[in-house]
From Swiss-Prot:
Source organism superkingdom: Bacteria
Known catalytic reactions: S-sulfanyl-L-cysteinyl-[protein] + uridine(34) in tRNA + AH2 + ATP = 2-thiouridine(34) in tRNA + L-cysteinyl-[protein] + A + AMP + diphosphate + H(+)
Similarity comment text for this entry: Belongs to the MnmA/TRMU family.
Record-linked CDD domains: MnmA_TRMU-like (cd01998)
Function (record text): Catalyzes the 2-thiolation of uridine at the wobble position (U34) of tRNA, leading to the formation of s(2)U34.
Listed EC numbers: 2.8.1.13
GO MF term list: ATP binding; tRNA binding; tRNA-uridine 2-sulfurtransferase activity
UniProt binding sites for ATP: 12-19, 38, 128
Biological process terms in GO annotation: tRNA wobble position uridine thiolation
The protein's name: tRNA-specific 2-thiouridylase MnmA
């Protein structure tokens, strides 16, 4: 009999292949496994996007196949209060937030963990995220590690977790590559084996982002200008654009000074004038940053960084690691200097720090340190 047989794990069942295989693997490892399906968004009448019922049906089918009980919980009000309102406020302020990070912080590893703990008497929770964790002995703090599949690693979205949360969490697919996860699901006859991965922001689903956002925030059209002040076109609202963006400006055929035909990129948002500044060419100095200032810091160890640290950083998901130096300003703010200038550093997004495979934590980008040519 496995040592795990006395341990109860509540798996977040999303109706996707990763959580399905997570539940199967934990059962194979001898744990007492139960599922919990979260409803985080009250669907509108638009049946085209209404996937919650389908996801629940898939989660139930998988649990039935594995012989485990599926609990259901509605976290829609917590989601609205703690994730969605922040998301809207950030967009209103001209920043580009990442709601998936906040959803993990406030819902999946807080509200979910508390419910699993207090109501379901769980020893652990488990999620289908592609991350790993250490299992230290001698009372050391567990660390969060990148997932083995570099293409799927999701540690960027989980940097707000504390070592206590990591200690209570299991990530069964973190040691696997995605094709292997699908192969296991197929072998076990799980209905989710070929289900495509969900994309887009959790509560928006596959629908068009601009249409969704315009329901909650009135659009304010304005000019798109060059750095010299030439009007290049019109934007429908600053909130629909992010720094470094190329698509969707509708000024593609327009030549710049001297007949320059290079593509246009968003370089800045001028909130006071409601103007989008666009520049030509990905190597334009206005797109580059020497570093950033970050706040709202979360370190996995929960100890503030007080010394200069050499490490790497990601300023967006699926980005190559950038070698950098962290310089503490105080316990709440840090300055980060890149070894080489970086493009499209975006206020509101998260900067997440690593030493090797270990995720140290991260913070919200408050502002970028603009590139100054020598």
């Amino acid at each position: 009999m496995s040592d795990n047989s006395q341990k109860k794990v509540i798996v977040g069942m999303s109706g996707g292949v990763d959580s399905s295989v997570s539940a199967y693997l934990l059962k194979q490892q001898g744990y007492q496994v139960e599922g919990l399906f979260m409803k985080n968004w009250e669907e509108d009448d638009d049946s085209e996007y209404c996937t919650a019922a389908e996801d629940l049906a898939d989660a139930q089918a998988v649990c039935d196949k594995l012989g485990i009980h599926l609990h259901k919980i509605n976290f829609a009000s917590e989601y609205w209060d703690n994730v969605f309102e922040y998301f809207l406020a950030e967009y209103k302020a001209g920043r580009t937030p990442n709601p998936d990070i906040l959803c993990n912080k406030e819902i999946k590893f807080k509200a979910f963990l508390e419910f699993a703990d207090e109501v379901l008497d769980a020893d652990y929770i488990a999620m289908g995220h592609y991350v790993r964790r250490s299992f230290p002995e001698n009372g050391e703090k567990p660390q969060m590690l990148r997932g083995l599949d570099g293409n799927k690693d999701q540690s960027y979205f989980l940097y707000t977790l504390s070592h206590e949360q990591v200690a209570r969490s299991l990530f069964p697919v973190g040691d696997l590559e995605k094709p292997e996860v699908r192969r296991i699901a197929e072998e076990q006859g799980l209905i989710t084996a070929k289900k495509k991965d969900s994309t887009g922001i959790c509560f928006i689903g596959e629908r068009k982002f601009t249409d969704f956002l315009s329901r909650y925030l009135p659009a304010q059209p304005g000019n798109i200008e060059s750095p010299e002040g030439e009007v290049l076109g019109q934007h429908q609202g600053l909130m629909y654009h992010t720094l470094g963006q190329r698509k969707g400006l509708h000024i593609g055929g327009r030549k710049g000074g001297g007949g320059n035909e290079e593509p246009w990129f968003v370089a800045e948002k001028d909130l006071k004038r409601n103007v989008l500044i666009a520049v030509q060419g990905q190597d334009h100095p206005m797109l580059k940053s020497e570093g950033l200032i970050a706040s709202q810091l979360h370190w996995v160890e929960r100890e503030p960084i007080r010394d200069v640290v050499k490490c790497t950083v990601k300023t967006r998901y699926r980005q190559q690691d950038i070698p950098c130096t962290i310089i503490p300003i105080d316990d709440e703010n840090i300055k980060v200097i890149f070894d080489e200038p970086e493009i499209a550093v975006t206020p509101g997004q998260s900067a997440v720090f690593y030493q090797g495979d270990v995720c140290l934590g991260g913070g919200i980008i408050e502002k970028r340190i603009k590139y100054t040519q020598a």
